[in-house]
Amino acid sequence: MAEGTDPLDDCGGFLDTEADCLDCDNLEEDLTELFDADTVSSLLDDTDQVQGNSLEPFQHHEATETLKSIEHLKRKYVDSPDKSLGIDNSVNALSPRLQAFSLSGQKKAVKKRLFGTDGDEAASGAESLQVESGFGSQQSVSDTPVTDILNANTARVKHLLLFRQAHSVSFSELTRTFQSDKTMSWDWVGGLADIHVSVLESLQTSLRSHCVYVQYDLNFAETNASSLLLLLRFKAQKCRDGVKALLSQLLGVQDLKVLLEPPKTRSVAVALFWYKRAMVSGVFSYGPMPEWITQQTNVNHQMLQEKPFQLSVMVQWAYDNHLQDESSIAYKYAMLAETDENARAFLASNSQAKYVRDCCNMVRLYLRAEMRQMTMSAWINYRLDGMNDDGDWKVVVHFLRHQRVEFIPFMVKLKAFLRGTPKKNCMVFYGPPNSGKSYFCMSLIRLLAGRVLSFANSRSHFWLQPLADAKLALVDDATSACWDFIDTYLRNALDGNPISVDLKHKAPIEIKCPPLLITTNVDVKSDDRWRYLFSRICVFNFLQELPIRNGTPVYELNDANWKSFFKRFWSTLELSDPEDEGDDGGSQPALRLHTGGTSQSL
C-alpha cells in the first residue's frame, strides 16, 4: 500500500473507546435475538389513527396565493394615494430635497382604470370619508358622485317649487314629458327662473321672428324670486336643446335655468288655463291661439256631444286613396285628426288596432271584387288614368330593337298574352345576366299592379296565393329547380286554364291563372327534359347587355313611357275601347260607402 494516511486511523480511537467486549462465543445467535420482533415491538405503531383535516394547510396556501394575485392585478390599474399625488416614498425617505432632482422622466399614468376610476378619484382617495361599520372596521367612501346627483335633483326640485309658488300651478300639470332632448315639437312650455323685468321688452320683440304665438307671464314667489311662464308656438318644429339655445341667445345668458316640456294638447283643463291666462291684463300674448286651445274652449252645438267613430268613413277614405297596408292606413289617418272629426274620434278610441285591421280587410275585398269585374282592357285603362302623359313610346321600341327582338312578332304574342289565350299565357325572357330581363318585366308589373312570386316559398302551400289578387304575375330568375317544379305541378297554369289556389285561413278557391312572366338564365328549349313545356311558353332572347350611362339605364322604362306605348298601340293590341265598357268612358263606377262629403286626399 502506498505511503500516506491510513483511512482507519481516524475512527480507530472511537472504536476502541465505545466498543463493548463480549464473552459470548456465538455472535451470530446474539445478533438474531437482538432483531427479534419481541425485542423491537415498540418500533412500529400499527394502531388506527384519526385522519384529521390534512387539506387545511393546502387550502390556506391556495387562498393566500389567490389573494396575492388579485392584489397584484388591481395594483396595475389603481394608483395608491401617494403615487397619484406625485409622492415618491423611496426618495422621500432618504431626503425630501432629492425629490427635486431626477434623471429620468415621470412615468405616465396608466390608461386603463379598474371600474371606471380616473386620476381625480384616485387623488381624492386620501380625502375620502372614514365610515365606521358595525363590526368596528373602517371603510373609505367617496361622496362625490352622490353629491353631484343630489345637487342636480335638488336644483330641479327647487325650480319646480319656485314655479308652483309663483304661478299657483304645478309644471307637470301643464306639460307632458319628453325623455329625449332631440324630440321635435311645435309647441313648448317654459319655466325660466331669475329673470329680470328689464329683459321682457327685448324678449317680446325678438320672439316674434321665431314664433307664431307667444304668451308669457312673470310672477314672483314668496322668496321674491322671479319665475317666467312661457307658451311658444314656433314657425318650425324644434327640440328641447334648440329651444334652450334660442332662449339663451335671446336673453344673453349662458347658464340658463329653464324647464322645457311640450304642453298637454288634449286636456280641456290645460286649454282653459291658457285661454283664461291670455285674458289677464298683466300677461302678454301675441298671434292667433293654437288650434288645440280654440277647439277645446269654443263651445257650440257641434261640440256639446262628440261624434262617434264611423268605420265606413275610414274605409271610404282608404279606398279613395288606394291604401291596402295597415301601417300606412293607421299613420296617415292619424295625421288627419287635426282637421277630420272621424279621425279625431279614431284616435280617442281604445280599439284603433281593430279598426285598422277591419278597414284594411274591407278595402282589399272591395278592390279585389272591382279588379275581377274588369277585363284586361278595362284594367289597363284604369291603371293608366292616373299617370302622366309626357312619356315616349319609342323608348320601349328602341329597347326591344337593342335586344334584337323583332317588333311585329313581339306585338302578336303580347296581344295573345294579354288576352290569356291558352298555350300563349306565359312569356319567358331568357338571356345572360345584366341584359335587362328583370328590368323590363318589373317595369311592366309595376304599371299593371301585378304580383311577384318567389320560388323560395315554394315549400309553402300558400306561395301561389298572390295570384288571386292580380291581373299579371312574375316569376323572377327561375332556376332549373324552378323549371322542374313548373313542369311537375304548374303545366295547367301555363296553359291559362283554371287552377286551385290554397289561401291561408280560407278554403281553396278556383281561379283562372293570370298571364305569367318568367325571367331566367336557363335555356329551357335546349333541354329535352322540359319538352312538355315547349308548346306552353313563348321565349324571347335578351342577349345584349343593358347599356348604363352615369349609373342610369339608357332606356328608361318608366310608367309614363309604358303609358305612351299602350296608348300608341292600343288598336294594334286589339284592346277594347273604354267607351265600349258601358261606363261612358269611366273604367269603374265610383263606390260610395256613406253619405256626406268627399274623402280627403293625400
From Swiss-Prot:
GO molecular function, one term: DNA binding
Family under the similarity heading: Belongs to the papillomaviridae E1 protein family.
Name of this protein: Replication protein E1
Annotated organism of origin: Cottontail rabbit papillomavirus (strain Kansas)
Positions of the UniProt region annotated as DNA-binding region: 138-306
Localisation per UniProt entry: Host nucleus
Quaternary structure note: Can form hexamers. Interacts with E2 protein; this interaction increases E1 DNA binding specificity. Interacts with host DNA polymerase subunit POLA2. Interacts with host single stranded DNA-binding protein RPA1. Interacts with host TOP1; this interaction stimulates the enzymatic activity of TOP1.
Known function: ATP-dependent DNA 3'-5' helicase required for initiation of viral DNA replication. It forms a complex with the viral E2 protein. The E1-E2 complex binds to the replication origin which contains binding sites for both proteins. During the initial step, a dimer of E1 interacts with a dimer of protein E2 leading to a complex that binds the viral origin of replication with high specificity. Then, a second dimer of E1 displaces the E2 dimer in an ATP-dependent manner to form the E1 tetramer.
Ligand binding (ATP): G431, P432, P433, N434, S435, G436, K437, S438
GO-annotated cellular components: host cell nucleus
Domain of life assignment: Viruses
InterPro entries: Helicase_SF3_DNA-vir (IPR014015), P-loop_NTPase (IPR027417), PPV_DNA_helicase_E1_C (IPR001177), PPV_DNA_helicase_E1_N (IPR014000), PPV_E1_DBD (IPR046832), PPV_E1_DBD_sf (IPR046935), Rep_E1_papillomaV (IPR016393), Znf_lg_T-Ag_D1_dom_sf (IPR037102)
Keywords recorded for this protein, A-Z: ATP-binding, DNA replication, DNA-binding, Early protein, Helicase, Host nucleus, Hydrolase, Isomerase, Isopeptide bond, Nucleotide-binding, Phosphoprotein, Ubl conjugation
A Pfam family recorded for this sequence: PPV_E1_C
